C-alpha cells in the first residue's frame, strides 16, 4: 500500500498563487458584466421615457409633453412653481407622471440612488434623465437664425428623427467644472472620470446608444452639426458636485444645411 504524499509548502503556495491569479482575472470580468448590465438597463429606461413621450404625442398633435407648438403648458405651475411650466424637465415629467404615461421608478437610473415620485411637485431628486432644452417661451420673438431655442422646439414632437437627441443621461458637475468645457465633464456611471462623460443618448427614432462622449452628429431643422456637444453651452450654473446639474440638452446651431 502506497503512502499518500502530502502537499509541500511550496506546492501549496503555488496553488494559492494560481487561485489568486484566477481571482484577479475573474473580478474585473464580473465587474464588467455588472457594468454592462446596468448600461443595458439604463438604455431600456431611456427608451421607455421616449416611448411614453410618443404615446402622449398621439393625442396632442404629435407634440411631446410641455409644449404644444405655440406655447409652454402652464398647467404644471401649480405643483412645480410659476417659473417651471412645461419648459423644464420637472414640468414635463410632471405631465407624464400625473397623466399616467410613466411611473416614478421608470425615471431613475440604476446608477443613482434617488427617490421615485409619489405625488405633488416633481423635484430634481425624482429623475435621472435630461431632456431637450426648450428654453424661453416662443412668444418672446427672436430671429430664427439666432434662436437655437426655436430649432430645438421644432424638434419637440414625434417625427422619428434619428439624429436628434431628446432624452439622455445628465451632465454632472464636478468641483472643477467650467461651463461648456468638455475637459471638466463628469457623469453618474462607473468608468466616468473628469473629462470623460458616459451615458445613454435617446434619439427621435426611439433608438438609444450608450456613448462614451457627449459629442454626436445632429441634424435638426435644416441644420447639421458633425460634432455637436449636447451640453454646450452648459445648462447648469455655478460649480459643485450636485447630482442634478445640466438636466437639459442643448444643441449648437451652425449655419450648415443638411447634406
Please place each PLM-identified region on the residue numbering:
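Amphipathic alpha-helical segments typified by the pilin-like N-terminal helix
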Residues: 2-44
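Short, well-structured segments within or immediately adjacent to enzyme catalytic domains
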Residues: 42-259
Amino acid at each position: 500500500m502506497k503512502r499518500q504524499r502530502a502537499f509541500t509548502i511550496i506546492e501549496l503556495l503555488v496553488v494559492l498563487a494560481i487561485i489568486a491569479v484566477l481571482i484577479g482575472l475573474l473580478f474585473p470580468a464580473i465587474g464588467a458584466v455588472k457594468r454592462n448590465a446596468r448600461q443595458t438597463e439604463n438604455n431600456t429606461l431611456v427608451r421607455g421615457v421616449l416611448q411614453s413621450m410618443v404615446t402622449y404625442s398621439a393625442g396632442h398633435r404629435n407634440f411631446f409633453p410641455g409644449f404644444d407648438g405655440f406655447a409652454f403648458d402652464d398647467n404644471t405651475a401649480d405643483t412645480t412653481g410659476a417659473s417651471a411650466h412645461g419648459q423644464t424637465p420637472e414640468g414635463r415629467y410632471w405631465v407624464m407622471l400625473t397623466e399616467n404615461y410613466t411611473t416614478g421608478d421608470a425615471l431613475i437610473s440604476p446608477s443613482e440612488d434617488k427617490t421615485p415620485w409619489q405625488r405633488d411637485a416633481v423635484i430634481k431628486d425624482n429623475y435621472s434623465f435630461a431632456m431637450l432644452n426648450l428654453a424661453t417661451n416662443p412668444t418672446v420673438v427672436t430671429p430664427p437664425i439666432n434662436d437655437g431655442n426655436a430649432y430645438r422646439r421644432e424638434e419637440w414632437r414625434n417625427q422619428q428623427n434619428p439624429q436628434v437627441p431628446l432624452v439622455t443621461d445628465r451632465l454632472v458637475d464636478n468641483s472643477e467644472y467650467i461651463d461648456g468645457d468638455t475637459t471638466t465633464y463628469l457623469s453618474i456611471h462607473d468608468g466616468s472620470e473628469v473629462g470623460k462623460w458616459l451615458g445613454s443618448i435617446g434619439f427621435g427614432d426611439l433608438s438609444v446608444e450608450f456613448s462614451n462622449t457627449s459629442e454626436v452628429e445632429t441634424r435638426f431643422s435644416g441644420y447639421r452639426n458633425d460634432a455637436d456637444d449636447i451640453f454646450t453651452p452648459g445648462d447648469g450654473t455655478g460649480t459643485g458636485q450636485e447630482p442634478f446639474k445640466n438636466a437639459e440638452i442643448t444643441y449648437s446651431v451652425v449655419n450648415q444645411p443638411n447634406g
